[in-house]
A protein has these predicted regions:
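N-terminal secretory/targeting leader peptides
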Residues: 2-25, 30-126, 136-254
Length: 254
């Protein structure tokens, strides 16, 4: 295999299962040792499951094929909590972060639109928008204001409606629910009387088990099975509508 892979070819071979964005900051320079740069990548997701495996595979491929760049992937909670991955980049503690744009609503009012819009585009349409419709450039303006650069890294596709501890038969059944639902989907269920809660992946099952939330939306049946959400809730609904396709985010400071 050629060592100088084109960016798009390399990302395809990385096996990334979520969508991501890379951001560049000038706050900190990467370590240099033995003639190559060393980057730290902070993930907003746990090591297990498709998202953790994706970013780990991405890092492994860089280390395998690149002579000038080496990376160390830290999964959620290993270096910083998952929701602080982008903050680690902006502070200079890491060169890259991998997560979902809707994890950072405290940093930008517009950033949630990069990740998911209720009743919005499917994965193929969103990828087409990114690469052929000016999506990357539009997202980059949002990320540049934060001192980072956006690059897409896959897409989870349409997601499910979520796991609930009671039956949902009408919109009124959302009233009073505390539900793990990030992004614009969370704002939508808030209009129905629910309280949206922002949680990183590793925190979803503990919150659902303890009763800190009454319901939780994650990804899809396969990923939700791996996350063990069936252990904490009886009712599973889909397909999702308020939480459509999810773009994952990867930010770097170099």
């Amino acid at each position: 295999m050629k060592k100088n892979l084109k960016r798009r070819e390399f990302l395809k071979k990385a096996g990334v299962a979520g969508a991501a964005a890379v951001g560049a900051s000038t706050l900190a320079a990467p370590a240099i040792a033995g003639g190559h740069q060393e980057w730290i990548i902070c993930s907003a997701f746990g090591k297990a499951g498709p998202l953790g495996q994706a970013i780990q595979g991405f890092g492994d491929n860089i280390n395998r094929y690149s002579e000038k760049l080496k990376v160390k992937v830290y999964h959620a909670g290993e270096l910083v909590p998952g929701l602080e991955a982008l903050d680690a980049v902006r502070s200079g503690a890491a060169q890259a972060a991998y997560g979902a744009p809707y994890y950072w609503p405290n940093l930008s009012d517009a950033i949630e639109f990069v990740a998911t819009c209720p009743f919005g585009m499917n994965a193929m349409e969103q990828n087409a928008w990114c690469y052929y419709g000016g999506g990357i450039e539009a997202a980059d303006k949002i990320y540049n204001a934060l001192g980072v650069k956006f690059l897409p890294m896959g897409n989870t596709g349409n997601q499910m409606g979520g796991w609930f501890n009671k039956e949902i038969n009408t919109p009124d059944d959302y009233k009073g629910l505390k539900m793990r639902m990030p992004g614009l989907g969370g704002r939508t269920i808030e209009k129905l009387g629910a309280t949206p809660v922002l949680l990183a992946g590793p925190d979803v099952l503990p919150a659902l088990t303890s009763g800190a939330v009454d319901a939780a939306e994650w990804i899809c049946p396969a990923a939700d099975l791996g996350a063990g959400l069936y252990q904490a809730a009886k009712y599973y609904y889909g397909p999702g509508s308020v939480s459509y396709t999810h773009l994952r985010a990867h930010e770097t400071d170099s």
